[in-house]
Amino acid sequence: MRIERVDDTTVKLFITYSDIEARGFSREDLWTNRKRGEEFFWSMMDEINEEEDFVVEGPLWIQVHAFDKGVEVTISKSKNEDMMNMSDDDATDQFDEQVQELLAQTLEGEDQLEELFEQRTKEKEAQGSKRQKSSARKNTRTIIVKFNDLEDVINYAYHSNPITTEFEDLLYMVDGTYYYAVYFDSHVDQEVINDSYSQLLEFAYPTDRTEVYLNDYAKIIMSHNVTAQVRRYFPETTE
């Protein structure tokens, strides 16, 4: 446990979960067991008093922050004269109430950290899935173009004649712009690829965006025969 004397009325300490366990407490004791939580904090106060001569006189103000590796606690003596005149029993009761309130707040904060951790884990898994799909396309040739707006996407879907059995495709969107990626198998003749690219450029534009960029920053809004899906959900636009 590391103790820092801030001033005459305030001390700050940081204790790792390993230190907590070495003192006979578990991480769960702090957040779920009221009696054990109070016992732990009073034992810390005894150590602080021994090392820093920080005697508990009247009510204390406590701030607790939970981190991945441990807990940081800031403890301040009250400077309010009325509160300093409280009896020892009243001060102890108020200290216990503060401990429980702060433990509850810290537990809620830990729950939020757990939710954030789970969310980041899911995001990493999703990114990993995208990379696996990208890796599976090592033997493919890719065309990526940019559509200025949804109307251009619709026009391409209705007026082009792609050979959909020869490729896989994905429609991405990022920053309000649509990107269309087409993946041709290695056995597809280059002439077919050139013809498909020529049709695309009648409605879209070349782009320097890569598949890696789109997988990391864009959102996939359609996949697997994109043109058929567009025709299904959107009517043909009129000139």
From Swiss-Prot:
Lineage: Bacteria, Bacillati, Bacillota, Bacilli, Bacillales
Pfam families membership: MecA
InterPro entries reported in the protein's UniProt record: MecA_C_sf (IPR038471), Neg-reg_MecA (IPR008681)
Protein name: Adapter protein MecA
Organism whose genome encodes this protein: Staphylococcus aureus (strain COL)
Its biological purpose: Enables the recognition and targeting of unfolded and aggregated proteins to the ClpC protease or to other proteins involved in proteolysis.
PANTHER family: ADAPTER PROTEIN MECA, ADAPTER PROTEIN MECA 1
Tree of life domain: Bacteria
One example GO MF annotation: protein-macromolecule adaptor activity
Domain notes from UniProt: The N-terminal domain probably binds unfolded/aggregated proteins; the C-terminal domain interacts with ClpC.
Subunit structure as annotated in this protein's UniProt entry: Homodimer.
Family, similarity comment: Belongs to the MecA family.
Biased composition (Basic and acidic residues): 118-128
Alphabetized Gene3D superfamilies for the sequence: 3.30.70.1950
Region feature Disordered, mapped onto this chain: 118-137
